[in-house]
Amino acid sequence: MSQESLVLRGTMRAHTDWVTAIATAVDNSDMIVTSSRDKSIIVWSITKDGPQYGVPRRRLTGHGHFVQDVVLSSDGMFALSGSWDGELRLWDLQAGTTARRFVGHTKDVLSVAFSVDNRQIVSASRDKSIRLWNTLGECKYTIQDGDSHSDWVSCVRFSPNNLQPTIVSGSWDRTVKIWNLTNCKLRLTLAGHTGYVNTPAVSPDGSLCASGGKDGVILLWDLAEGKKLYSLESGSIIHSLCFSPNRYWLCAATESSIKIWDLESKSIVDDLKVDLKQESEMSSEGTASGKNKVIYCTSLSWSADGSTLFSGYTDGLIRVWGIDRY
């Protein structure tokens, strides 16, 4: 059986600060959208043209602070962003303009998501609340106090499982919570982390949830029953997690590297580290930032066909990895 590993295919350079989120198109088209602490969102065309893997097609501006998250509608027509300015924005990508502003959170918005049918939007904030909106920018429900998180809500996701419509949230209170989307009531609290949770990820079939954060441990949960299945040690703070769309793999962006696990064997498929020397040889302009700065990955997204892993870093670069068989 052939082994698989990932190789650096190229980089994408336009952001001037941390790349906080990457959204890839559901139809595997040549567009990706990224958000950054430079307060902008960039729409890219993937060209696969030598070391410069893609070119910035449009820069979307309007947020007054770091843009922390961005997602795409399934038809690729709209992007949705959340910012430390406390707002969400819905962007018309054809026009390059803000179609809607969502105002209601009282502190930084840390995470946004679209439901599978794109008709509902969920957001998470440092104000410790989760808000459910329609696409007109009207807040339909606020989850706060009571069963809600007792600290910043760092990440929120819809489960792709339509039979049991669910919102999954992760928080600095060290828990992951599962909410019933139909009535916004708490279904389960998943406790086990010893530090804040940065990111829950839901598997493509909606059966599994992976969570990670400060303690460097990834916990795998059965989403239906809320049972902890097993844990994976990453060794350093986890900033982002994502499941491969077509392999039984989980990727973790940690402070030391990007680690990819095969969940069947629970073994590491690859451990991706940045090689600045190799990159300056690949690119004509050399590396933009200081040679000795600690650079780590803050955002991850697979292409829809699972062949390409896009990773965003603290130096503003997007590094693009492709699967090699050997």
From Swiss-Prot:
Keywords: Repeat, Ribonucleoprotein, Ribosomal protein, WD repeat. Pfam families: WD40. WD repeats lie at residues 14-45, 62-92, 104-134, 148-180, 192-222, 233-262, 292-322. It comes from the Eukaryota. The keyword Repeat applies. InterPro entries: G-protein_beta_WD-40_rep (IPR020472), RACK1-like (IPR045223), WD40/YVTN_repeat-like_dom_sf (IPR015943), WD40_repeat_CS (IPR019775), WD40_repeat_dom_sf (IPR036322), WD40_rpt (IPR001680). Predominantly expressed in roots. Also found in leaves, flower buds, shoot tips, stems and young seedlings. GO terms for molecular function: protein kinase C binding; ribosome binding; translation regulator activity. The keyword Nucleotide-binding does not apply. One of its GO terms (cellular component) is cytosol. GO terms for biological process: negative regulation of translational frameshifting; rescue of stalled ribosome. SMART domains: WD40. May have a role in cell division. Belongs to the WD repeat G protein beta family. Ribosomal protein RACK1 subfamily. This is Small ribosomal subunit protein RACK1.
